Amino acid sequence: FGGNIHMRRYPLQCDRGVIVSGRAGGVSSFFDSAVGGTGPHPLSGMGSGFRRIKTDEPVLVDLVHAHRGYIVDMTRMFVAGTLSQEWHQRLEDMLAVKDTVVDVLDQGKTCEAAWDEAYGLAVEFGYQENLMGMKPDQSRFLGHSVGLQLDESPVVAAGFDRPLPIGGAMAIEPKVVYAEGCIGREDAWIRDQEGMRPVTADGAWPWLTEW
């Protein structure tokens, strides 16, 4: 499980995964992503560092896999112990935001419409300051197309006034970020003639695993 993932935005390439816990989950990325992490060194400031995982804090695992060159992206949450009710509620709210994105894209509406509806729901939940990062480093998207590269188009964001095409694949990844950590979920979806269906596990793999 190694190597880099190609990105459309030159000259970036992406590591295969980000694993962050607690306060490391509140560290922003050097590129347009909700979660960055400390990395092992300031000169490699992305992903896992040397911070020890503490009891009852959220652990986010965001992994990218390439099968015969085609990319999928998936995020799940873990906790050593028990997650607080506050973090549980945040995760439930992000699942509702995800369902909104999937529903709008399933209807063949534009990616911008999916952003508008899902972002509006997140604001209604009270996440305007924390959705996809903390100000001033918030990312302004809720999903990105995937294919031969990680950051394909269209994107669930303002300005993308076209639908996800039939045969298109989209990683949908609402997350909320705080100084004390982050939480969210992500799965890759494909739109076919019958609508949206998950390529990765979606609800078949638990959103949260306690150990």
For each predicted feature, which ranges?
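Active-site neighborhoods and metal-handling regions in enzymes and metal-associated proteins
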Residues: 1-211
